[in-house]
């Protein structure tokens, strides 16, 4: 199964991330985001960041997760290439704990692709068939 694929949206880019589990699909969504910004195959897993978020449903959880990744990228000036996600469900909704690994951006070494301005809710979806599919669009 492919990890993710992109689709065209006017002035934006969308992606569908896949996984056998919800966690794996979220990890692949993180990889998809950072492959829009740079080629993650050249990003070393030197620095570790962890965060936890809670959201009322799976779609809101996906949005909040992607927003947090973008926030850490912008504030810490980092690229990430390794994602470990744990998701739990309760009566209040969903909780996500993520450990992500990457390194400080070095544009002399890292390929600069596109700048992500924002994560959007437009067409965002979490779907379970024989596997999980997460769909999101980012504003470039």
Descriptions of predicted regions:
Residues 2-140:
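N-terminal intrinsically disordered, cationic/polar leader segments
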